[in-house]
């Protein structure tokens, strides 16, 4: 089969020197500290979607987000793709939203926080140039992942 149903979302690492914007997500299905982001609306460009989601969740207006990797997996005959972006270009005042509390955090301190599931290894895709994919796969009934 050459066609599969696909759902697109995004995450963005907003950098200011050694600090990054994080959100303590309140959603029960994926709670914990992560980067801001969300769903791509039908017909919306990927870049416009990450700019919109970041502004909705943080109050910051980002510019020039650069695609730096993906997270993907297949489940229930659908593929889920999370587009990873990063940027150093932003303006505005940081503010929390109904999605969760947001703040600037030193990137070196992230492993000490209560991160979202597998966020510590996802961070490697954002920061290591030789990695571009965080791929979940099933082995029997167990979910595993590979960094590629």
What label would you give each PLM region?
Residues 73-93, 122-124, 130:
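Active-site-adjacent beta-strand/loop module that shapes the phosphate/pyrophosphate-binding cleft
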Residues 19-55, 141-148:
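Conserved Nudix-box catalytic region and its N-terminal flanking loop in Nudix hydrolases
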Residues 7-9, 30, 80:
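Short coil/loop residues immediately preceding or within conserved phosphate-binding loops
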Residues 14, 84-88, 106:
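Short, well-ordered beta-strand micro-motif
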Residues 61-69:
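A short coil-to-beta-strand element that immediately follows conserved catalytic motifs
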Residues 1-20:
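Conserved N-terminal beta-strand and adjoining loop/helix that marks the start
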Residues 95-127, 145-148:
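NUDIX/MutT-family hydrolases
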């Amino acid at each position: 089969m050459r066609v599969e149903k696909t759902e697109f979302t995004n995450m963005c690492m907003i950098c200011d020197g050694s600090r990054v914007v994080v959100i303590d997500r309140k959603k029960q299905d994926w709670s914990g500290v992560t980067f801001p982001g969300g769903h791509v609306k039908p017909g919306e460009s990927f870049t416009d979607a990450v700019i919109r989601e970041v502004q909705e969740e943080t109050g910051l207006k980002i510019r020039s987000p650069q695609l730096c990797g993906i997270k993907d997996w297949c489940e229930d005959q659908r593929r889920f793709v999370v587009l990873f972006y990063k940027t150093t270009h932003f303006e505005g005042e940081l503010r929390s939203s109904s999605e969760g509390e947001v703040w600037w955090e030193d990137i070196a301190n992230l492993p000490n926080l209560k991160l979202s599931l597998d966020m510590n290894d996802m961070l490697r895709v954002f920061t290591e140039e030789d990695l571009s994919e965080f791929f979940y796969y099933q082995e029997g009934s167990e979910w595993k992942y590979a960094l590629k």
